[in-house]
Amino acid sequence: MRPNEDLVLLGDNLELLPQFDGETFRLAYLDPPFNTGRRQRRTTLATVADASGDRTGFQGRRYATRVLAESSFGDEFDDYLAFLEPRLREVRRVLDESGTLYLHIDYREAHYVKLLLDEIFGRECFLNEIIWAYDYGARPRRRWPAKHDTILVYVKDPERYWFDAEAVEREPYMAPGLVTAEKAARGKLPTDVWWHTIVSPTGKEKTGYPTQKPEGILRRIVQASSRPGDWCLDCFAGSGTLGAAAAALGRRFVLIDSNPEAVALARRRVGLFGPSGRAGKEVVTGRSARS
């Protein structure tokens, strides 16, 4: 099938992707579980006035901490590459000839996954290794702190892929005094190292979903590798950041996730974006692969 409206699908992406015609999507962004070997959790807390509370605040007032919501998903696979391979082959099939895949991964599996992508797409179709660098979280004392994710970029056809550098929001020069005033005012095209904060725990963008990615990262990807009206795919949709960025930039989208909680969140989120009040449609189909 070819979609004629934005979709948010609940089910196993390995069952749902074969239902789409080949060469349907201009852009695919995948943020699969990172195989960390642990369960990812996010707890939303609130502090409320309570005379018997366990915390003391301004002028001796007592407060208690309440858990508003908890969410989690498993992030452990016996054979991670065997899990990814059939899904990546399906993603390649549904990409059009000028399409691009962005695969978001971390240091534990990036080198193995790149070899897998070389096999599926071909080494000549490797475009970039993007490093998303941030500075947040714990700092181990017996090794260098890991403060980056890797985004591997592959194209369907190295002679025909779409990349629009002019559409990408530019960033300031690190040393503006070394370039002309005109260049400094215009900014520069980002390199393959993207310095960007994580989603602020207290910011408006926060949804409360574990491992939520910043919209700024997805906006840059959508701007560079798709045009207004193009179809974008995320088959590990999570909180729906790809859908939010795509709709805000005038693209169409299909989001897939096997977690009902993620699908409900993504459905609400994309309903707030898009021209003419366009909202994603929730379709429940397929078998849930993880919760």
What residues fall within each predicted segment?
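Positively charged, low-complexity nucleic-acid-binding target-recognition regions
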Residues: 275-291
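Core catalytic lobe of class I
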Residues: 1-276
